[in-house]
């Protein structure tokens, strides 16, 4: 049987943009730089002192970490408080009125007992006694009136109806083996037009099932619509078959599933799809009946002249039958006019837009305040953290201008303490080409093996995500997957390095959503969600192993597909009994982008060291 359903759709782009704005401000004042700056300065002092054999240099620094961290924490708390208030406000002006009015709208068309429906004889002739001119009786009709009949009375007085019920029972019995004849007959004569569960009732029920995050309203067509040649048979059948599924005929089926509104599904569009009576809601119900009741063809026909097919039956509807159907529709339209659901939903768009605009203005002001304080106030606090003294021969002085900031401070320190006699790579090493590949000498073979570093905080697998939406990795951490793969993140929570001691073939799962969304706003149209360690090697399915990767390197494109080819090469070596060991991946980014620019992969195959540099394009 076909259920006529309507869904309420939510367009969440505006709200998602709002969340992105909040997150961008939080990112702008991320406190990790403040928390680490004291350690960085201490390390610099230590490095300089280790090279200053004659003790000619004296360096002192000011502690800035606690102050910067405090400021960062203040703004994060303020932003989270704001986000919480925004959520509550939107629930107040959108969710609550919407739910309340939906409940009111359905209250008038649900739980209508078939046993209380009276059919008033319109003066038909012969076997058409309750036929085309009959209509649902008004409120002043009484069961005792000579020209008024209940459905139960009509069914018992006409064996043709009894035969139809028997035939339908046999069909429904095929779907529900436990359906008894008595339950079916009771449902046919005493059932309700449809059953409705309010959102409040549904939420209480779902509390036992760990509430879901979205709401889905599926309305079953349940009004009594006379869509058959015989109006009484139509009334009974449509009331029964549209309100109850074949597998649950005796107990009924709820209109609302009751899933809880998601916090992210606030800005509601597409509200015209709500199934109000008289607006396409009833028409579908008749089609549902026709599809079920006459799918068996001629054996389901009744004496009133139904032909073999649904199309022929519809063409036989008489003018009187149409008048009676219109009478029912008018009653439904009156109901629709008496409810303010439509007006409420129309106004809702304006309220939601106003709320979003207010929040955008607030975010804009806060972003400017944050920018001003970070660029001005903090610079003054940390200017001249070092007092420059004498520098030994062979080292550059540590110079800090009046406008020294956290951003360039680390670069100055790094330049000052880096020895000038460092080893440079040869031409082959320095070439950054997507197809770059070479072997290196034995004295470099251990350079890519995993070495512990104090610059990363080790966390348990499962604790490596920040409590943010959308999901994001924590900054400056090291985590190990259940398969033994080690990952490190940078100060932005981006995967920076990956280490695998001994690669092996293991089947992994796939997370399609993560693969479609990783990289966020920096993702390009031609990007895939690329696994750093492939699923066939036991790589994680989540964003802790995924990056935005050009499909031209991630797939087997002719003359390209460099990442794909590397994975296939490893697979072939493992299948042939060779070892792929000591893998180190370095993932390079540009600025604050979440999309990598270059992948550098080092690995050993049977003791021979290899390096690949692959451009992400």
Swiss-Prot record:
Compartments where found: Secreted; Cell membrane
Induction description: Expression is activated by mutations in esaB and essB (newman).
Source organism, top-level taxon: Bacteria
Main location: secreted
UniProt-annotated stretches for the region Disordered: 420-448
Gene3D superfamilies: Extracellular Endonuclease, subunit A
Cysteine pairings via disulfide bonds: none
UniProt keyword annotation of Membrane present: yes
Basic and acidic residues composition bias: residue spans: 426-438
GO CC, alphabetical: extracellular region; plasma membrane
Keywords linked to the UniProt accession: Cell membrane, Membrane, Secreted, Virulence
Function: Component of the type VII secretion system (Ess). Plays a role in Ess secretion during infection. Required for the efficient secretion of EsxA. Required for abscess formation and staphylococcal persistence in host tissue. Possesses a toxic DNase activity that is modulated by EssG by forming a nuclease toxin-antitoxin pair. This nuclease toxin targets competitor bacteria.
Protein name: Type VII secretion systems protein EssD
Species per Swiss-Prot/TrEMBL record: Staphylococcus aureus (strain Newman)
Gene, per the UniProt record: essD
